[in-house]
Amino acid sequence: MSLLSDLINLNLSETTDKIIAEYIWIGGSGLDMRSKARTLPGPVSDPSQLPKWNYDGSSTGQAPGEDSEVILYPQAIFRDPFRRGSNILVICDAYTPAGEPIPTNKRHAAAKVFSHPDVVAEVPWYGIEQEYTLLQKEVNWPVGWPIGGFPGPQGPYYCGIGADKAFGRDIVDAHYKACLYAGVNISGINGEVMPGQWEFQVGPSVGISAGDEVWVARYILERITEIAGVVLSFDPKPIKGDWNGAGAHTNYSTKTMREDGGYEVIKKAIDKLGLRHKEHIAAYGEGNERRLTGRHETADINTFLWGVANRGASIRVGRDTEKEGKGYFEDRRPASNMDPYVVTSMIADTTILWKP
């Protein structure tokens, strides 16, 4: 195994200028991630320098067998924490040979929203709190839980330490450092209320980069869980009963919200979000009705409610924002399995572009 490890960690720069680019895309479910690698003649610093590529869409549920070619357009580059050196991870979106975005390509529509002059002028910032659950591979049951049984009630696990309270920290810390190495604007991690559940935060990130960074952070996390022999779940309610679900709370502000008088802008934006509550819920992740019950720090899925420091609301405004009269708010409705391109662009569209 030591020879295998040595080969995996070979420093290519000592013998060649060539690099490895891992092209990453979203598969047919809209949540599964796929990737494959190719050799390039030398280091690359911008996606525009990368060639387009293709893959067999009939094997990912994204194209019929008789016309299976799907084209990958490179969109964002990150350093590769697995191969290191000058090797890169490449976030791509997917198109038909005719240049039309395929149905699971949500980035294309999001990029249109974020390139609108009114949105560009507002410099939208996002901070996304991505919750997830680590599962034992053979039994599909949270790590640290007795097989077929349950741990003690919730309470000691949130931000907890100790072998009886924190399960999977080695994966979490490896992911944290790998994201920092890759150039992801990861801002923190913490253990969650349900044991075996964790959270990482990405942001503040501007516009389309928020979606790119969440997707590559998810990719890095699943690669690490693959190495650890653990299953990664983004199910919004992985365990029935008196256990917290998993969300992707999305913190948001615009330039005018961050300036003096911004609190009034925030309140108007929240009013607009309330008017489109059903449309947002429909786009905020599958199975969210199992999570948004009005319990476990959620608002009921059919009710739109906002408040200051209220974690049982749809939208939470922080006390600092209220006190300073400017800042940001948190949309607590998105599920952990949401598409960040959809959620971020929809919030921008509703609060900046949409006219009720």
Curated annotation (Swiss-Prot):
Domain GS beta-grasp: 19-99
Entry's EC annotation: 6.3.1.2
Disordered, as annotated region: 37-64
InterPro entries, sorted: Gln_synt_N, Gln_synt_N_sf, Gln_synth/guanido_kin_cat_dom, Gln_synth_cat_dom, Gln_synth_gly_rich_site, Gln_synth_N_conserv_site, Glutamine_Synthetase
Keyword Repeat attributed: no
Reactions catalysed according to its record: L-glutamate + NH4(+) + ATP = L-glutamine + ADP + phosphate + H(+)
Cellular location(s): Cytoplasm
GO CC aspect terms: cytoplasm
Record key words, sorted: ATP-binding, Cytoplasm, Ligase, Nucleotide-binding
Gene Ontology biological process terms in this record: glutamine biosynthetic process
Pfam families: Gln-synt_C (PF00120), Gln-synt_N (PF03951)
Stretches assigned to coiled coil: none
Subunit structure: Homooctamer.
Family designation: Belongs to the glutamine synthetase family.
UniProt name for this protein: Glutamine synthetase cytosolic isozyme
Organism for this UniProt entry: Lotus japonicus (Lotus corniculatus var. japonicus)
Lineage: Eukaryota, Viridiplantae, Streptophyta, Embryophyta, Tracheophyta
